[in-house]
């Protein structure tokens, strides 16, 4: 009897909807597989006290099947060992991105993280939680995206110290959550204009937009020189909101919401010199 009542209520609710009511639908854009490379070099300085580490790093990234210089990173950071098993860190980056449509554009990023670790024989396990904010240094349509995007990254990593070897293989999995994306749940359909009204913009949409898998090995070239050789695979999901500059869906009939999917697979080399 209870199931019948629920079904009757659902049917009545559906019949109560106005005929021709507009429903916000999502299109899909599957970008397929893209390949590229990541190359970086940096300096890691153990300060006084020895619990403090300072780091400077430069990185270049290639995409479009190794055919385009996509991003340039300049980063500085610091980590402090709070306990034998817990570290806290801060960092900042200047990011220059090569966009197909708009050329080179700059962003700045700042973040804070906590990393806990434990060891079992020659195995080492760590969990890192990183909160970051990325601000675009160019004009954006705020009905489509937030000028400053907040994200939370959660990473689990395992590594193994091979006896009498210069190599230390590892594997890591990371989830990235967007924390303040434009929420389309507040969009309303304007019957007189025949368009969606997106002017009630609220930045409170939270969803996972990237899953990253990385595996590789650290190679101790010398006492103070380390080379990281790795492969990285990113599965990306991003909600693209296409509105005009006045906050309404476009008259051309282009889809307002598109879920853009894609997979990136890349090779990486990262060199660190320790002072």
What residues fall within each predicted segment?
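Outer-membrane beta-barrel transmembrane domain signature
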Residues: 129-250, 273-275
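Residues that define the transmembrane beta-barrel architecture of outer-membrane proteins
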Residues: 33-39, 70-72, 104-110, 146-152, ...
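Outer-membrane beta-barrel "beta-signal"
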Residues: 114, 259-275
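Residue-level signature of outer-membrane beta-barrel architecture
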Residues: 45-47, 80, 92, 116-118, ...
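Repeated loop/turn-to-beta-strand initiation elements of outer-membrane beta-barrel proteins
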Residues: 47-56, 85-90, 121-125, 164-168, ...
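Hydrophobic/aromatic-rich structural module bridging two neighboring secondary-structure elements via a short loop
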Residues: 68-123
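Outer-membrane beta-barrel domain signature
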Residues: 26-32, 63-67, 99-105, 141-147, ...
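Transmembrane beta-strand segments that form the barrel wall of outer-membrane beta-barrel proteins
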Residues: 22-31, 50-66, 87-100, 128-135, ...
């Amino acid at each position: 009897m209870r199931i019948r009542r629920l079904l009757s209520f659902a049917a009545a609710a559906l019949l109560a909807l106005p005929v021709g009511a507009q429903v916000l639908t999502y299109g899909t854009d599957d970008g397929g597989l893209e390949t590229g490379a990541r190359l970086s070099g940096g300096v890691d300085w153990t300060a006084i006290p020895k619990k403090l580490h300072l780091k400077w790093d430069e990185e270049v990234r290639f995409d479009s099947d190794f055919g385009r210089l996509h991003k340039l990173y300049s980063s500085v950071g610091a980590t402090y060992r709070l306990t034998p098993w817990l570290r806290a860190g801060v960092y900042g980056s200047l990011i220059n991105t090569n966009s197909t449509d708009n050329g080179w554009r700059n962003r700045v990023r700042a973040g804070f993280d906590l990393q806990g670790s434990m060891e079992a024989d020659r195995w080492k396990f760590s969990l890192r939680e990183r909160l970051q904010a990325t601000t675009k240094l160019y004009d954006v349509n705020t009905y489509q995206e937030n000028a400053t995007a907040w994200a939370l990254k959660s990473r689990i990593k395992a590594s193994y110290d091979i006896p009498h070897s210069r190599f230390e293989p590892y594997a890591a999995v990371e989830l990235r959550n967007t924390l303040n994306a434009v929420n389309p749940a507040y969009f309303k359909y304007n019957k007189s204009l025949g368009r969606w009204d997106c002017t009630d913009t609220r930045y409170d949409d939270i969803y996972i937009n990237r899953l990253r898998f990385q595996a590789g090995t650290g190679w101790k070239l010398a006492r103070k020189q380390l080379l990281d050789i790795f492969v990285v695979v990113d599965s990306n999901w991003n909600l693209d909101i296409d509105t005009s500059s006045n906050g309404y869906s476009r008259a051309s009939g282009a889809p307002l919401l598109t879920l853009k999917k894609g997979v990136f697979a890349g090779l990486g080399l990262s060199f660190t010199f320790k002072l």
